[in-house]
């Protein structure tokens, strides 16, 4: 018999097989990299009995009503019962589809199955390759409120040096993509997170419809081959991955202090999910037992002293504490206010201290060491309150004991609690202690189409100088020191939307901003 001819593999098929092999190599190497970034955790301590969850009435989601349709316009006979029933069934099916679209997805999700569709995100798991080796009223676009003249006129040498360094951060412009800056998610950016690795900037973005984008900003543009010498070769888009991990807005990211592979995300779909970068799987870390219970989660944080505990706030004015080693039904949930909590944070060095910001126009400090009351009245001890003229959007603790808030009275307020480590459990703070040390005029009127401006501290600054970032309605990102002095106003050519969601890398002087188009601005 004549020898069989080997099948000819097309260039496309060869490239596809190479991509599959590369993805497998990338994912298999992430665990090794994670061990280099963060050592293996100590053996788990004996499980302690968790406190019973306070009983409360769950909020039920309203069933979507079918859209009314005209029988006459649909050409149905008024007496045709069969056709009427058919129309009713079709309406019910559409209503069920609308309801299912906003229901959270339970169970484990493989990233390969929830990839966001679209040319910009067709790289899929390739985007995880970056983890290998781990004051006018209203906006005035382009008008600076902090200029080079402010830097030059600084008389204090230390402050001037810091201002020069922060103002010297350059806008990331490696990729000449349309619109100048990479698009991480399809819809408006609502949350950002920097992976804590210092080897390269890796940014996570969450949008208003539940998509999570991942981008490794260290990748270099690769010029595509071009056979025509008369025309310039096209530069391919950067590798960006986006996955539909939630069904509603992703409000917050948090990175495990002991596992470099673990990324936690929270959403208005009432769930907290853990993304395992090694396995490429998103698992449910917390969700109400009743799938119809609506518990929109506005923020999450984790105490540095206990990586198995996660704290979360909700739009229903509650604060929750959940041990990740136990079932969601064992979580403690406390009612703190009748109005929504827009943001909260834990003191990085004293994680039993919680600062909450609420629609009830208050900043409140709570102590998790002392839980008091019974039944629905059970809650952490309230240490102090400060009232603002309008609602407070976010409260952010620094590692040195400052709290920065943004509010709709167009103020950034900085509170100073240097002796927080000496507070006894449940000890009340005086009115004088709760007064802000500094108030900074700042336009916080975002309107409907811009994500709410929230201050975010650099968690562990290398230089030991506490500083935070916040979006600016004039299409900049502002950088402030703990004493309220402005250090920089970051901008650049081609920024056509407000980088409302601003984030500092935990240790490096890298600043990210996300806008309403799903695009990223990055200063390094």
UniProtKB/Swiss-Prot annotation:
WD repeats lie at residues 184-225, 245-285, 295-332, 336-376, 385-425, 447-490, 493-524. Disulfide bonds: none annotated. One of its GO terms (cellular component) is nucleus. Keywords: DNA damage, DNA-binding, Repeat, WD repeat. InterPro entries: WD40/YVTN_repeat-like_dom_sf, WD40_repeat_dom_sf, WD40_rpt, WD_repeat_DNA-damage-binding. Residues 35-79 are annotated as: Disordered. Pfam families: WD40. Belongs to the WD repeat DDB2/WDR76 family. This is DNA damage-binding protein CMR1. It comes from Chaetomium globosum (strain ATCC 6205 / CBS 148.51 / DSM 1962 / NBRC 6347 / NRRL 1970) (Soil fungus).
């Amino acid at each position: 018999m004549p020898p069989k001819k080997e099948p000819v593999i097309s260039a496309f098929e060869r490239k596809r097989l190479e991509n599959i092999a590369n993805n497998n190599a990338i994912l298999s190497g992430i665990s090794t990299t994670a061990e280099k970034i963060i050592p293996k955790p100590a053996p788990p301590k004996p499980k302690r009995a968790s406190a019973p969850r306070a009983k409360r009435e769950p909020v039920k989601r309203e069933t979507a009503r079918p859209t009314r349709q005209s029988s006459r316009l649909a050409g149905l006979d008024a007496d045709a019962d069969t056709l009427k029933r058919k129309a009713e069934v079709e309406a019910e099916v559409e209503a069920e589809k609308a309801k299912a679209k906003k229901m959270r997805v339970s169970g484990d999700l493989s990233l390969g199955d929830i990839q966001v569709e679209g040319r910009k995100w067709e790289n899929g798991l390739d985007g995880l390759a970056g983890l290998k080796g781990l004051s006018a009223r209203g906006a005035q676009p382009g008008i600076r409120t902090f200029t080079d003249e402010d830097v030059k006129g600084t008389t204090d040498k230390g402050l001037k040096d810091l201002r020069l360094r922060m103002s010297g951060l350059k806008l990331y412009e490696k990729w000449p993509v349309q619109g100048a800056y990479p698009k991480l998610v399809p819809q408006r950016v609502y949350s950002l997170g920097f992976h804590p690795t210092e080897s390269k900037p890796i940014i996570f973005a969450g949008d208003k419809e539940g998509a999570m984008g991942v981008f490794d900003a260290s990748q270099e543009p690769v010029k595509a081959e071009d056979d025509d010498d008369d025309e310039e070769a096209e530069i391919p888009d950067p590798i960006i991955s986006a996955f539909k991990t939630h069904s509603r807005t992703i409000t917050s990211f948090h990175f495990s202090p002991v596992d470099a592979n673990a990324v936690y995300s929270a959403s208005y779909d009432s769930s907290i999910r853990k993304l395992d970068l090694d396995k490429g799987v998103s698992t449910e870390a917390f969700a109400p037992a009743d799938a119809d219970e609506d518990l929109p989660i506005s923020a999450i944080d984790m105490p540095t002293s206990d990586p198995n505990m996660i704290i979360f706030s909700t739009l229903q004015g509650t604060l929750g504490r959940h041990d990740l080693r136990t079932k969601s039904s064992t979580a403690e949930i406390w009612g703190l206010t009748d109005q929504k909590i827009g943001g909260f944070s834990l003191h990085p060095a004293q994680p039993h201290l919680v600062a909450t910001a609420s629609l009830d126009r208050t900043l409140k400090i709570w102590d998790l060491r002392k839980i008091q009351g019974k039944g629905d009245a059970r809650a952490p001890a309230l240490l102090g309150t400060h009232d603002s003229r309008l609602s407070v959007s976010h409260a952010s603790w620094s590692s040195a004991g400052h709290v920065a808030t943004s509010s709709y009275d167009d103020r950034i307020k900085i509170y100073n609690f240097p002796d927080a480590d000496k507070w006894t459990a449940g000890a009340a703070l005086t009115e004088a202690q709760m007064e802000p040390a500094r108030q900074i005029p700042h336009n916080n009127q975002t309107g409907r189409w811009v994500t709410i401006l929230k201050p975010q501290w650099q968690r562990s600054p290398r230089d030991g100088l506490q500083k935070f970032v916040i979006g600016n309605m004039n299409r900049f990102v502002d950088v402030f020191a703990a004493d309220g002095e402005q250090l920089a106003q970051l901008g650049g050519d081609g920024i056509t939307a407000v980088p409302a969601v601003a984030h500092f890398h935990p240790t490096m002087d890298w600043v990210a901003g996300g806008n309403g188009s799903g695009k990223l601005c990055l200063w390094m």
